[in-house]
Amino acid sequence: MVAQTLDNLKQMKPLKTELMRFMMSYKFALDEMNTKINILKQEFKYIHDYNPIEHVTHRVKSPESILKKIQRKGYDLSLASIKEGITDIAGIRIICSFTSDIYEISNMLQRQKDIKVIKCKDYIKNPKPNGYQSLHMILQIPIFMSDREDHVYVEIQIRTIAMDFWASLEHKIYYKYNKEIPQKIKDELKEAAISATQLDKKMEKIHKEVNEIKELDNDEENLQELLINNERFHVPDDFLIPIKRAYYDS
């Protein structure tokens, strides 16, 4: 009896190792993607003086959640089937200030040579019937372990603060009503989604106007400091103002 138990345990050990590697590969994929995103954040902060990424969250689905999805989709209960059939085990959500930031970040990630774009769904240009908006991408990235190279799917969701607030509230309401939301609440959520879109557009318009003013101010400051042969000269207003007036009037 003891010998049989030991044999069973020995047989289970390779399976346990594979299960551990399987789940860890998704954690490693998140680590890789988070590194890429953090590099972009640092570059924007220090080089471009603007960071389009407000914050980032991530998660790996629990084995229980994976099992429920397998049963719902009718997939075989095997690691190979899970890997190919379920592409959102590893997930990252990027929250941006403005809608234009969403597409800029998406393009920057897609241009990276080790990232393969599997699928892209634009729920901003084509919102879901309930009003949900977000940009979804399924990416595949290489993960290098001690004895193998694996290619892992990661789901990326990119949305604005307003879109995220709406989605978070809708999610809570959805489960509060046990997935049966009254029509009146659905209509109000749809109106709120439209308001969120209008808010995003308004805030982006203000942001662009502020940037234009800032650029003009910077140009003004730059005019007052001339660099000639590595020697810096200050241009006084009494000299600069009539020169500018004559230039713009000509």
Where are these regions (language model features)?
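An acidic, glycine-/histidine-flanked metal-binding catalytic module
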Residues: 2-30, 34-43, 155-250
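Active-site acidic/histidine clusters and adjacent loop/turn architecture
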Residues: 20-81, 88
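Charged, alpha-helix-enriched surfaces in structured cytosolic catalytic cores
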Residues: 24, 28, 61, 65, ...
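Short, charged low-complexity intrinsically disordered segments located at boundaries
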Residues: 60-70, 96-101, 135-142, 203-204, ...
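Long beta-strand-rich cores associated with HINT superfamily self-processing modules
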Residues: 83, 96-205
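Terminal, regulation- and interaction-focused segments at domain boundaries
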Residues: 89-96
